């Protein structure tokens, strides 16, 4: 069974890590992909590797609603429908609240929460009209448990889970046939830790990430959720290294 083939999938944060690995796997399974990220040069390289016929790209900063809307419009204009949106873009600067890193707080809120909301708001009219769709939001194990030094990041990921569950209930009530999935990774080997400016926190996180799993593990979970029959919905995954205790 391959329910991924020919589905039109939009992915934010597609230029590296989980996003890029998801592109690789879904393209192997025949999906048509629309990729958004701030680094257009990286997207162009991915497009060349995967193939122009099945991949469209759009420079996208998820903190800007107009750019998110343009990404969704590109998907519809190029392929005529939108089957899946994967809200993957995210940031994880870490610090204790007393450090008062307000710029980093705002960055996390803008990308991790508002970016997800902008994606949902942009794609819902298309999915409602076609009476089908699937929205996959990347949360985190930090959306299930709070760590010292991670209060704001955890807050953003708890918010992603709450928003996605609210969306699931609202779409079930109206019978739109729109599926939702929350995917909560643990330590994954990506660029996510590069944004940590606090030296003490960076050292602790780097220690945790010594046993990080590869991003293709998350890509496989995404592929699984999309591949499920339309009448069933995989609502939530937690995927972390076997050795990760938290």
Swiss-Prot record:
Top-level taxon of origin: Bacteria
Keyword Oxidoreductase: yes
Matching InterPro entries: NAD(P)-bd_dom_sf (IPR036291), Sc_DH/Rdtase_CS (IPR020904), SDR_fam (IPR002347)
Sequence positions that bind substrate: 140
Active-site residue list: 153 (proton acceptor)
Pfam families for the chain: adh_short (PF00106)
Record keywords, A-Z: Oxidoreductase
SUPFAM superfamilies registered for this protein in UniProt: NAD(P)-binding Rossmann-fold domains (SSF51735)
The keyword Oxidoreductase is assigned to this record: yes
Molecular function terms from GO: oxidoreductase activity
Record EC number: 1.-.-.-
Positions bound to NADP(+): 10-34
Similarity field: Belongs to the short-chain dehydrogenases/reductases (SDR) family.
This protein's name: Uncharacterized oxidoreductase SSP1627
């Amino acid at each position: 069974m391959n329910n991924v083939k020919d589905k039109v999938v939009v992915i934010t944060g597609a230029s590296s890590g989980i996003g890029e690995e998801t592109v690789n796997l879904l393209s192997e399974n025949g999906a048509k992909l629309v990729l958004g990220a701030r680094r257009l040069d990286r997207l162009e390289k991915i497009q060349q590797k995967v193939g122009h016929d099945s991949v469209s790209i759009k420079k996208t900063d998820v903190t800007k609603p107009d750019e998110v809307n343009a990404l969704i419009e590109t998907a519809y204009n190029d392929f005529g429908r939108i089957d899946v949106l994967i809200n993957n873009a995210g940031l994880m600067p870490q610090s204790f609240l007393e450090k008062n890193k307000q710029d980093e707080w705002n960055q996390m809120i803008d990308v991790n929460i508002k970016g997800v909301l902008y994606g949902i708001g942009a794609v819902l009219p298309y999915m409602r009209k076609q009476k089908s769709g699937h929205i996959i939001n990347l949360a985190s194990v930090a959306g299930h448990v709070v760590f010292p030094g991670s209060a704001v990041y955890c807050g953003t990921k708890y918010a992603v889970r709450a928003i996605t569950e609210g969306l699931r209930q609202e779409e079930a009530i109206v019978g739109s046939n729109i599926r939702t999935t929350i995917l909560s990774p643990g330590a994954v080997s990506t660029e996510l830790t590069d944004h940590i400016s606090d030296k003490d926190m960076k050292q602790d996180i780097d220690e945790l990430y010594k046993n990080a799993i590869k991003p293709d593990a998350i890509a496989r979970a995404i592929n699984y959720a999309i591949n499920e029959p339309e009448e069933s919905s995989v609502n939530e995954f937690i995927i972390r290294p076997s050795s990760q205790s938290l």
